[in-house]
Amino acid sequence: MGEAALAVVKLGGSLLFEDEGSLKEGYVRGFLRELREYLAESNGRVVVVVGGGRYARNYIQLGRRLGVNEGVLDYLGILVSRLNAATMYAAFYNSPPLIPETLLDVHKLLASGLRVVFMGGLQPGQSTTTTAALVAESLNGSLIIATDVEGIYTDDPKRNPAATLMERVSVEELRRMFQREQVAGEYRMIDVLSLNVIQRSKVKVFVLKGDPPGNIFRALRGERVAGTFIEA
């Protein structure tokens, strides 16, 4: 996708968590190692938006059973995503975490000289993918969405072995696929609000398989990686 001066990387929770909810220590170590190598060889800056993952869903499901309303449940998910981001910040910088709570906070942290910002969600009613799209729009950056499949498929590749990877797809085509409920395994990752932001701002978006984490940084370097470009 061309070497990126400023990139936003959305890390899906499926990459960070085991099925039972524990963090994948090996993956986090590998991601941070690749990130350090990328920064050492480039002038790039990166905003890492971390999802809540299984841990957030556990809290949300418990809260729902306890009668908590959906807006408050969203906020619980945001807090968990920020805790995930704080853990990665602490491991990367070995200092108390500075986690943005607004878009302005992101700008301030980058202006202070930080080359990497770690963050979770920003507000209820918004997925962390939408958050990542808004950050990319605000910073005029590119967006990489890292998930557990190689991109967007014609059907769910985990259920349909005949599904094929789409190398390019337009926002309008994705909208039609949403209406047919055929966005292969991506409903949880690319929602309609995210598509609205991508379309209005013409953000460059590439969806790829984030495991191994080297895939993400190969894409940031402009190397060819399997995945899907979303065209506004």
UniProtKB/Swiss-Prot annotation:
NCBIfam families reported in the protein's UniProt record = pyrH_arch
Q: Give a short account of what the protein does.
A: Catalyzes the reversible phosphorylation of UMP to UDP.
Oligomeric state and interaction partners are given as: Homohexamer.
Location of this chain's protein in the cell: Cytoplasm
Main subcellular location: cytoplasm
Biological pathway: Pyrimidine metabolism; CTP biosynthesis via de novo pathway; UDP from UMP (UMPK route): step 1/1
Q: What's its catalytic activity?
A: UMP + ATP = UDP + ADP
What family does this chain come from, according to its entry?
Belongs to the UMP kinase family.
The way its activity is modulated is described as: Inhibited by UTP.
Query: Which positions in this protein are listed as binding UMP?
Result: 52, 74, 122-128
Q: Does the keyword GTP-binding apply?
A: no
Q: Which UniProt keywords apply?
A: ATP-binding, Cytoplasm, Kinase, Nucleotide-binding, Pyrimidine biosynthesis, Transferase
Q: Which GO terms describe its cellular component?
A: cytoplasm
- InterPro entries xrefs: AceGlu_kinase-like_sf (IPR036393), Asp/Glu/Uridylate_kinase (IPR001048), Uridylate_kinase (IPR011817), Uridylate_kinase_arch/spir (IPR011818)
GO MF terms listed in the record are: ATP binding; UMP kinase activity
- State which Enzyme Commission number(s) the record gives: 2.7.4.22
| Matches recorded under PANTHER family | URIDYLATE KINASE (PTHR42833), URIDYLATE KINASE PUMPKIN, CHLOROPLASTIC (PTHR42833:SF4)
> What's this protein's name?
Uridylate kinase
Binding positions for ATP? Answer: 13-14, 53, 57, 147, 153, 156
Instruction: Give GO BP annotations, semicolon-separated.
Output: 'de novo' CTP biosynthetic process; UDP biosynthetic process
